[in-house]
Amino acid sequence: MPLAPPPEKMMFQLSLRRRGISDQAVLRAMDAVPRDLFVTPDLRDEAWRDTALPIACGQTISQPFVVAYMTEQLQLKPEHRVLEIGTGSGYQAAVLSRLCQQVLTLERFKTLADSARARLESLECHNVEVQLGDGFDVPAKAGLFDRILVTAAMEEVPGALIARLDLDGILIAPVGPHQATQTLVRIRNAKGGIERKELVAVRFVPALPGIAREL
């Protein structure tokens, strides 16, 4: 007989549903990814709480509801190719990996990129490629993407990043000042042109250009 999930994980799952996450594929992906593996050992007792937690290099792992909400807004299909800007702990990429064909995730901190890669490999997320790179300067050879997810706040989404969307592609990003509340924005490369919709208020660490010289 399989063991029942711990009470804190059951509450975690229930809270996502109560807060409006209804896409069953997204809920299954969130259930399948062990968030406690993506936080530091001293914070594992907090892993199933719906709150952001600190990780290395002054970054954070987003609260689960925000991860689920952004994932749901991407409207992912199994054949999609996804670009993630800001790997962080690798938690968001692990969720995405269960919903699409391929994930390319860029991280400017080598420490984070290396540790995320190791976690994702341990979970056999073989369709995720972690690269040390600059999210403001995506390599041309990467091509176009069906979906792009930015996990740090941009003051504005660069046109060069929007240009990486394939036709009918969707980009989700927090947009706004770095030291204030931002707005989660959905941008679609529709047949008639670029469509933009503001979704909800969020708070993210800033997206910075370049690759970190240290860490």
Curated annotation (Swiss-Prot):
**Keyword Transferase tagged:** yes
What EC identifiers does the entry list? 2.1.1.77
The record's annotation in SUPFAM superfamilies points to:
S-adenosyl-L-methionine-dependent methyltransferases
Q: What is its main location?
A: cytoplasm
Active-site residues are S62
Instruction: Provide the leader sequence positions.
Output: none
A biological-process GO annotation: protein repair
Q: Name one GO molecular function term.
A: protein-L-isoaspartate (D-aspartate) O-methyltransferase activity
Domain of life, per UniProt, equals Bacteria
A GO cellular component annotation in the UniProt record: cytoplasm
Q: Where in the cell is it found?
A: Cytoplasm
Keyword set for this entry? Cytoplasm, Methyltransferase, S-adenosyl-L-methionine, Transferase
According to its UniProt record, which reaction does this protein catalyse?
[protein]-L-isoaspartate + S-adenosyl-L-methionine = [protein]-L-isoaspartate alpha-methyl ester + S-adenosyl-L-homocysteine
| CDD domains in the record | AdoMet_MTases
Record family assignment: Belongs to the methyltransferase superfamily. L-isoaspartyl/D-aspartyl protein methyltransferase family.
Q: What does this protein do?
A: Catalyzes the methyl esterification of L-isoaspartyl residues in peptides and proteins that result from spontaneous decomposition of normal L-aspartyl and L-asparaginyl residues. It plays a role in the repair and/or degradation of damaged proteins.
Task: Read off the HAMAP family from this record.
Answer: PIMT (MF_00090)
Which named protein is this? Answer: Protein-L-isoaspartate O-methyltransferase
* Organism field: Rhodopseudomonas palustris (strain BisA53)
**Gene symbol of the encoding locus:** pcm
